[in-house]
């Protein structure tokens, strides 16, 4: 196990790891226990009661965070002609087809999301092994394979995030920055949680949301009551 810094250990002392905090309490505590001098990112980890090895229990989706992530995502678009012009006008950070694929094959990965028009997907498939493991492969289910590149770019730049369960049945997503006020963090958390609950596979048995933790990138994970799905802005446990 990696050795923890003194700042991390001091922050961890403020947390009762045997307690399940309300989302609002966790948001406040995450900000208090951040050991970063920068504007730290606030993250959520969720353990689900699914078996990702089964195709019918793969949980994935998208959510438009009402207050964004605090970061303007870098978006690339695979498109040509008129659609390429639309993507550039919408604010895409890089637009292209073969040239963009070659850059990525050469090791360039300085972007947060990738969009493709349907006619470009056969070409983009050549770099699926590069993009897929990083969660960057365009997919119709997440709205990133589309002819409406203007909307897709605007959605992602505006705070749309993707979530996908990993092999250990965990989901990880961002809900904002430490500079956000507590209510905005909680409202972003609630929006994401609602989508995750809607994405519950019909074949999943038993408890669906098994564990939730909130933390900053460098801070300790704060255990959150997974049963708190309503009245999230209430401070008291209930």
From Swiss-Prot:
One of its GO terms (molecular function) is rRNA binding. The keyword Electron transport does not apply. Keywords: Repressor, Ribonucleoprotein, Ribosomal protein, RNA-binding, rRNA-binding, Translation regulation, tRNA-binding. GO terms for cellular component: large ribosomal subunit. GO terms for biological process: regulation of translation; translation. Residues 227-238 have a biased composition (Basic and acidic residues). SUPFAM superfamilies: Ribosomal protein L1. InterPro entries: Ribosom_uL1_bac-type, Ribosomal_uL1, Ribosomal_uL1-like, Ribosomal_uL1/biogenesis, Ribosomal_uL1_3-a/b-sand, Ribosomal_uL1_CS. Residues 219-238 are annotated as: Disordered. Pfam families: Ribosomal_L1 (PF00687). Binds directly to 23S rRNA. The L1 stalk is quite mobile in the ribosome, and is involved in E site tRNA release. Protein L1 is also a translational repressor protein, it controls the translation of the L11 operon by binding to its mRNA. PANTHER family: 54S RIBOSOMAL PROTEIN L1, MITOCHONDRIAL, LARGE RIBOSOMAL SUBUNIT PROTEIN UL1M. Belongs to the universal ribosomal protein uL1 family. Part of the 50S ribosomal subunit. This is Large ribosomal subunit protein uL1. It comes from Rhodococcus jostii (strain RHA1). The lineage of its organism: Bacteria, Bacillati, Actinomycetota, Actinomycetes, Mycobacteriales.
